[in-house]
Amino acid sequence: MSRDRDRARPDTRLSSSDNESDDEDYQLPHSHPEYGSDSSDQDFELNNVGKFCPLPWKPDVARLCADTNKLFRCFIRCRLNSGPFHDALRRALFDIHMIGRMGYRLKQAEWETIMNLTPRQSLHLRRTLRDADSRSAHPISDIYASDSIFHPIAASSGTISSDCDVKGMNDLSVDSKLH
């Protein structure tokens, strides 16, 4: 399988007038279903939300443990019945691992929905995915989970992140969000 398929790309950088659109309408031209096209450095400088995955990414099991333990502690502090949240986090971590282990990729929209990011917020994530893919000693095929044995995820009606308005979240039932 040729690893050069993603390296030779036409220049699809956005002009400065393209960057003025609303975040919800922001779309990069797609050259790859998982991480889209290259963006200008200016796009990355303007985007602070996605800086949770800086280049170069490398495996860090201690960080993974610390991050998941923060979430478990948060669940315990915030909810009287945190069991369903613990199960949901464990299931999500396991599902992501198994999708990769089975040799499947996720498409850009799926990453954005799973990680609760808008297309603009996902720029750093997609740049890191592209970089990790180019450095990988074990290339994976271009088989996408939603195109094969799995059901594609429905487009979300919106994202909920630290910089988004979360009015009405208290009205949602735990069971409807977890299943």
UniProtKB/Swiss-Prot annotation:
InterPro entries, per database record: IE68
Cross-referenced Pfam families: Herpes_IE68 (PF02479)
Keywords of this entry: Early protein
DNA repair listed as a keyword: no
Segments of this protein annotated with the region Disordered: 1-40
A single BP term in Gene Ontology: regulation of gene expression
Basic and acidic residues composition bias: residue spans: 1-12
Bridged cysteine pairs (disulfide): none
Family note: Belongs to the herpesviridae ICP22 family.
The protein, known as: Transcriptional regulator ICP22 homolog
Organism: Gallid herpesvirus 2 (strain Chicken/Md5/ATCC VR-987)
Gene this protein is translated from: MDV088
